[in-house]
Each structure stands twice: as C-alpha cells, then as structure tokens.
C-alpha cells in the first residue's frame, strides 16, 4: 500500500523549486550582465565576480580534460536520487531533515544544469578579507552547505521519544 505523498518528506519538494529559481536566476543575471572575470563590489569583503568552474568545490579536478564534467554530473544525479528516496521514506513532520535534503537537491540540480548546459558551473560570490579571497562560489553551493550543516545539526539534537513520534 502506498502512502499519500503529502504525508512524506516529498511534501518539501517546493523548496527544491525555490532554490532552483533563485540559483538559476542569479546565474542568468551574471551571464547577461558580466564578462568573464568582471567584478563589482557589493559590500566590504563581498564582491560579485563572474568565474567559471570546470571542476567541483575549490575547482577540484578543473583541469582534468573534460571527463570530470560527466563524473560530477553522475554524482549529482546519484545524490539527488538517494535524497529523494530518503525524503519519500521520511515523514513530512521531520522538517529539519527534509529541508536539508531539499536544499541539497536544489543546489545539486542547479549546478548539474550548469554542467550539462554550459559545460561549467557559473560562480559569482567572492568573499574576501584583506588580500585573502575564499573560493568563488554560487547560491547552489550555499544551499548545499546549509543543507549539510542542517544534517549535522540534526545529529546533535535530542531524538524524539516513541510517544512523541506517534
């Protein structure tokens, strides 16, 4: 017997759509208004800077000849499938986990779209202190990191008792 989708964690899939719209919209604006390498200061220690990332986080494997595009696309698809199954198996009331999974899926799909459509991931957020610059990243990366942090946080929270779960 199948359970109603609204009673599962899939009820939180709307958050995936929100992350995708914000991420892809921000990347579209960068592509339309910036040339590669352009930088605009927003605040002290924060710039918009158009960069292309052919690898993964911190440009890992960026100069590997192209195979990494498909490797990272496969990883993103696999992670999305696993998290969707986990959302389906969880209750809609397990908010923290489901929000975390939705943020990770939305971020992974945003970067997957870039890899498949452009052949690279559009990055634009440049955080710096003095002359030191953190790796340029995008809103999809931010969603993935927030989702991962929520999963870690959930591990430290007290588990509900059997009575509370009923």
Curated annotation (Swiss-Prot):
| Topology relative to the membrane | Multi-pass membrane protein
- Mark the transmembrane ranges: 12-32, 70-90, 102-122, 137-157
Q: In which pathway does it act?
A: Protein modification; lipoprotein biosynthesis (signal peptide cleavage)
Molecular-function GO term, any one: aspartic-type endopeptidase activity
Q: Pfam families from the xrefs?
A: Peptidase_A8 (PF01252)
Q: Does the keyword Transmembrane helix apply?
A: yes
Task: Name the active site residues.
Answer: 123, 141
Q: What's the EC number here? A: 3.4.23.36
Instruction: Enumerate the UniProt keywords alphabetically.
Output: Aspartyl protease, Cell inner membrane, Cell membrane, Hydrolase, Membrane, Protease, Transmembrane, Transmembrane helix
What InterPro entries does its record include? Peptidase_A8
Q: Main location per UniProt?
A: membrane
Location within or outside the cell: Cell inner membrane
Supply one GO CC term from the record: plasma membrane
Please verify whether the record's keywords include Transmembrane: yes
Give me the reactions it catalyses. Release of signal peptides from bacterial membrane prolipoproteins. Hydrolyzes -Xaa-Yaa-Zaa-|-(S,diacylglyceryl)Cys-, in which Xaa is hydrophobic (preferably Leu), and Yaa (Ala or Ser) and Zaa (Gly or Ala) have small, neutral side chains
Q: Which domain of life is it from?
A: Bacteria
Q: Which GO terms describe its biological process?
A: proteolysis
Say what the protein does. Answer: This protein specifically catalyzes the removal of signal peptides from prolipoproteins.
Xref: PANTHER family: LIPOPROTEIN SIGNAL PEPTIDASE
Q: Which NCBIfam families match?
A: lspA
Spell out the HAMAP family in the cross-references.
Answer: LspA
Write out the similarity annotation: Belongs to the peptidase A8 family.
Q: What is this protein called?
A: Lipoprotein signal peptidase
Organism name: Salmonella paratyphi A (strain AKU_12601)
Organism lineage string: Bacteria, Pseudomonadati, Pseudomonadota, Gammaproteobacteria, Enterobacterales
């Amino acid at each position: 017997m199948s359970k109603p989708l609204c009673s599962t964690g899939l009820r939180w899939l709307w958050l995936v759509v929100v992350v995708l719209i914000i991420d892809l919209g921000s990347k579209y604006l960068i592509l339309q208004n910036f040339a590669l390498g352009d930088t605009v200061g927003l605040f002290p220690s924060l710039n918009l800077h158009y960069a292309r990332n052919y690898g993964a986080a911190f440009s890992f494997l960026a100069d590997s000849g192209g195979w990494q595009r498909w490797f990272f696309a496969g990883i993103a698809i696999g992670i999305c499938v696993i998290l969707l199954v986990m959302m389906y198996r969880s209750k809609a009331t397990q908010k923290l986990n489901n929000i975390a999974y939705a943020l990770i899926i939305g971020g992974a799909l945003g970067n997957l779209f870039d890899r498949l459509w452009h052949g690279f991931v559009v990055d634009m957020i440049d955080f710096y202190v003095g002359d030191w610059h953190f790796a340029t990243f995008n809103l999809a990366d931010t969603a993935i990191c927030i989702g991962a942090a929520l999963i870690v946080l959930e591990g430290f929270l007290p588990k509900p008792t059997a009575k509370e779960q009923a």
